[in-house]
């Protein structure tokens, strides 16, 4: 299994603090059935800047350590890029990393809103052959209040990744319920851990897949995990036609 969003590289952001933490996370990932991780340290979020060369070097060093420790896990380079207006230009300058050098780019919104220029930026990126993958949209306040924002971005070609912990209920029942509504509306294309450590931000991969199978049957979790394989091969992912999210006041978000 492939995890496309994880903060396993040591001392690069708010994820693994050192190489010992990285090894501990690697062992936890393997226990969850994960064999490949795309390391996605935060980049340009106002706190962290992790340049491509540094990410590649850190991934190489961690892979050497994993071999030494006999841990059956391989780490690939990527970034979780906080959205900003010059993403397209900086990709052209090779100043940003896509996910393992594929056409897929992991883009993070601020947690409280969706920038108004996002739609135009995503359009421009797609003209250049890239596919923006929206990181954890379920945790964005404006999307929770107005999920049609996500619907319109997905309708126009973006993909999105939900966090395993959200589906597993780690962030609360309301966020779990909202996450399931996004899945139900065909607005989610990947499940990933966004793991930062093994104590407070663990993988929860198997829990999430269990929830998905219980709610929607076995075909959906298979499709979402297969999409990670397709991404890694730089191929077109599976998609179902997106639908508007059902408005249920029960969830407390709208």
Curated annotation (Swiss-Prot):
The keyword Manganese applies. Inhibited by vanadate and sodium pyrophosphate. Not inhibited by sodium fluoride. Changing residue 5 to A: Large decrease in activity. Keywords: Hydrolase, Manganese, Protein phosphatase. It holds the Pfam family CpsB_CapC. It catalyses: O-phospho-L-tyrosyl-[protein] + H2O = L-tyrosyl-[protein] + phosphate. It comes from the Bacteria. Changing residue 7 to A: Large decrease in activity. Its EC number is 3.1.3.48. Signal peptide: none annotated. One of its GO terms (molecular function) is protein tyrosine phosphatase activity. Its cofactor is Mn(2+). It is an enzyme of class 3 (hydrolase). Changing residue 3 to A: Large decrease in activity. Optimally active at alkaline pHs. Activity increases with increasing pHs. InterPro entries: Caps_polysacc_synth_CpsB/CapC, Pol/histidinol_Pase-like. Dephosphorylates the phosphotyrosine-containing proteins YwqD, YwqF and Ssb. Belongs to the metallo-dependent hydrolases superfamily. CpsB/CapC family. This is Tyrosine-protein phosphatase YwqE. It comes from Bacillus subtilis (strain 168).
